[in-house]
Design a protein with these regions (language model features):
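Residue-level signal for mature regions of secreted extracellular proteins and peptides
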Residues: 11, 16-17, 53
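C-terminal motif of bacterial Sec signal peptides marking the signal peptidase cleavage site
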Residues: 19-22
Length: 641
């Protein structure tokens, strides 16, 4: 046994020695060129072009050693990370660029595609690109689309006699409700170019089926409610002041809020501003009231029945009203009873949030049956604790500041996010007006901004900014874009409506800033639950899915960073087919597109894209817009030729 083992060991050693000699070059062997280094194989993200209803061209580039590989593209309409087990189209190209034409695709469908290169041992994949094939009806719908044609400069039809042509002319502080009859009803502050509205009552209404074409209905209130002057004098008497009898034409009729309570019941809260001062020169301005009307059917514009007084201004300074009406820092009233916003919570609780300038916005719980405050209201003056029934603070720009530029609160609840959203108008209404939003899990706060600022318990500036004075390259742009209402269509689509004004001295018109148009805009919600308002007005453009190919080209980009009273202007940003940003603010950065979510990511910022009207084009036409958010900074964009 030992001899046999030794024999095999000897044979093995001889073979090893022979192999060693054969494989070594020795001193006389010629120099052998070393093998080139192996470059790791990589595939660029596919670029999709020439998209039709049933085909698309896909291109990728290969870097590294790619000989003797199987290579091509795999794609799927189901698997978001397609593999070679899905549909495969092999490519026989020997260069570093692969290109194939995908065919037999389904119209109007999202596809996911990536390149691959494989050996018998492994497969290398590119990143995924998604695209949407053209809908069979998409081209026809978009080609036949007619943009709204009504003029923005409506001065030629501003007269009361031409009110049937107004559409969204002469709108200020709008409030909108979707009624049982399928119409959207809009009501507003008494304001118009040249005060044309004065011939037709108060809290004017109009309605629309499509949010684009609006029918003027007229005033919902014919005269000053009978309760207003008696209530004013009741309070004045309790304050030790003499009775007054102001001219009814001098009262202000401001900022209503309309809501559907249930089938067959609609409520409109409204503001009445009393003229004059409390007790002559050297005293603060007179108070305001919030009242209530109800209607069973808003199609009956004369069917609004007044339900009387709801709440009034309250002061935490007792009867120390001898403050000059322009001594803002010593403002007599803590709460200002205008700009109501009414909300019914998912649990069935009714709340009113109101206020303008002064110390911020208070919230009051209401009785569901009457629509009036649950708590008994004491005299509207006293200490902070004594006037507590007039509301608890839910938001303020600066704690302790008695005169701050914030008004027009609008509170809504989004069941998809579980948050209450408080929209606020900032600054003066003529030019600087801009819209902010904060949110809370509770209707009465604390409300917090996107930057973490608690504006309920600590106070502070509210972010993000949703609208701001702006100007695209063509046209005059818009200013004074705020005091909004926010509503949905019951189908998951949300809208923002407010007035917007012409800038000062447009076309040589010294009164151009009094031209006020109603603007309805679409809202998109970010993935983390913040609302974004589109940079152009809603025009019922067919929402055909946007393809990646359509994004390539020039965009007008606006940074909506806060600048008091200044129109933010656009600059051109170009997106190239190879996913580079070649000009503009983010030049040198890259971009990508998620066709499924309709989100363009540029310079790391998610931009939500949507088809809307290019209102500055002549003639108006459909285009693509984007809106995005990066912490406190908002971005608007519009695709241009």
């Amino acid at each position: 046994m030992k001899l046999k083992n030794c024999f095999f060991f000897t044979i093995w050693m001889l073979i090893a020695c022979c192999l060693n000699v054969a494989c070594s070059g020795g001193g006389d062997d010629p120099f052998v060129e070393p093998e080139p280094p192996v470059v790791a194989l990589s595939l660029s993200a596919p670029v999709v072009s020439d998209i039709t209803t049933e085909s698309a061209v896909v291109t990728t580039k290969i870097t590294g050693n790619s000989s003797d590989l199987k290579k091509g593209f795999c794609y799927s309409s189901i698997n978001k990370n397609p593999m070679t087990s899905d549909i495969v189209l092999e490519c026989s190209s020997t260069g570093n660029e692969l290109q194939v034409s995908l065919s037999n695709l389904e119209a109007g469908t999202v596809y996911y595609v990536r390149a691959y290169a494989s050996t018998s041992f492994s497969t290398t994949y590119s990143s995924v690109t998604s695209f949407v094939t053209t809908s069979n009806t998409a081209n026809n719908e978009l080609d036949s689309y007619q943009a709204p044609s009504y003029p923005d400069d409506y001065t030629s039809i501003a007269d009361w006699s031409k009110r049937s042509q107004w559409n969204l002319s002469n709108v200020h502080d709008p409030t909108v409700v979707l009624a049982d009859d399928g119409y959207y009803y809009m009501y507003q502050t008494d304001a118009s170019y040249g005060n044309a509205h004065e011939k037709g009552g108060h809290f004017h209404g109009r309605r629309s089926k499509d949010l684009v074409n609006w029918e003027y209905l007229g005033g919902t209130m014919k005269n000053l409610p009978d309760w207003v002057i008696p209530k004013l004098n009741e309070i004045r008497k309790a304050m030790g002041l003499k009775e007054v009898n102001p001219d009814k034409k001098t009262f202000g009729y401001w900022a209503p809020c309309v809501r559907k309570v249930k089938t067959g019941l609609y409520r409109m809260y409204y503001s009445i501003v009393c003229p004059g001062t409390i007790d002559g020169d050297g005293t603060w301005s007179e108070r305001a009231f919030i009242g209530l009307m109800e209607n069973t059917d808003p199609a009956n514009n004369d069917g609004w029945v007044d339900k009387g007084y709801v709440i009034t201004n309250a002061s935490d300074k007792g009867l120390n009203y001898r403050v000059k009406a322009d001594d803002w820092s010593r403002c007599y009233f803590r709460w200002n009873a205008i700009d109501p916003s009414y909300i019914i919570t998912p649990e069935g609780n009714h709340w009113l949030i109101y206020g303008s300038w002064h110390s911020g916005f208070p919230a009051v719980e209401l009785d569901a049956e009457t629509g009036k405050p649950k708590a008994t209201l004491p005299n509207p003056w006293g200490t902070v604790n004594e006037i507590a029934p007039y509301g608890k603070l839910v938001a303020t720009r600066q704690m302790g500041n008695r005169w701050q530029g914030s008004e027009g609160p609008e509170v809504v609840y989004n069941p998809n996010t579980g948050y209450y959203y408080l929209f606020v108008a900032y600054d003066a209404l003529d030019v600087p007006y801009n819209t902010r939003v904060v949110r809370s899990k509770n209707v009465d706060g604390p409300y917090v901004g996107i930057d973490g600022t608690d504006v309920t318990t600590k106070g502070g500036d509210m972010y993000p900014i949703l609208t701001h004075p702006y100007k695209f390259s063509n046209g005059h742009g818009w200013v004074g874009i705020s005091h909004c209402c926010v509503f949905d269509d019951g189908k998951g689509n949300w809208y923002y409506a407010s007035q917007a004004r012409f800038p000062v001295n447009v076309g040589g018109n010294a009164y151009s800033n009094a031209i006020m148009m109603g603007h309805v805009r679409s809202i998109r919600w970010t993935e983390d639950g913040w609302p974004l308002v589109m940079p152009e007005r809603y025009g019922a453009v067919p929402q055909i899915p946007i393809t990646e190919e359509e994004l390539v080209g020039n965009w007008e980009h606006i940074d909506l960073g806060y600048s008091y009273g200044n129109q933010k202007k656009s600059n051109v940003m170009a997106l190239s087919a190879d996913h580079k940003i070649t000009s503009g603010t983010w030049k040198g950065s890259s971009w990508s597109f998620d066709a499924d979510k309709q989100i363009l990511t540029a310079n790391g910022v998610q931009l939500y894209v949507q088809r809307e009207v290019d209102w500055e084009a002549t003639p108006r036409r459909h285009t693509i817009l984007y809106v995005g958010l990066n912490n406190t900074k908002t971005y608007w964009g519009k695709k241009v030729p």
